[in-house]
Amino acid sequence: VAELRMGTKFHFTGFLKGDDVDHMYAISDVYVMPSVSEPFGIAPLEAVRHNTPVIISKQSGVAEVLNNAIKIDFWDVDAMADAIFGLLHYHSIARMFTELGADELKKLKWEHVAAKLVTVYEKTLAQRA
């Protein structure tokens, strides 16, 4: 970023908390989490909650849960660049991901997860009886 003199286009924030987190998502056009190993990152879900389109690596744990995000291979920097470019230049695609992501996030509430878990336990117990 520094070599290309693009520092004004990116935010490398380090640790943020509280209102600073909300502000950063509010001013961001795209959230990118290119982690090679992230058991489960909550940050992409926070980005979706703030209507920011998300790009995550296929290798991340959140990729198993979040369907309405662009998923790229961590090592494929060309695909990552293409995804960023696409979201920045094709607003209808970015809007589609934010709208579908918001709908998806509503289904990821703890109440729904708990209900699914209860169903799994009930089915397991019924099979053992």
Segments and roles (model prediction):
Residues 15-16, 23-28:
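Short alpha-helical donor nucleotide-sugar binding micro-motif in glycosyltransferases
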Residues 36:
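Aromatic "clamp/platform" in nucleotide-sugar-dependent glycosyltransferases that forms part
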Residues 53-56:
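Short hydrophobic beta-strand element within catalytic cores of glycosyltransferases
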Residues 69-78, 86-91:
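Conserved acidic donor-binding segment of nucleotide-sugar-dependent glycosyltransferases
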Residues 92-122:
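A charged, aromatic-enriched C-terminal amphipathic alpha-helix characteristic of glycosyltransferases
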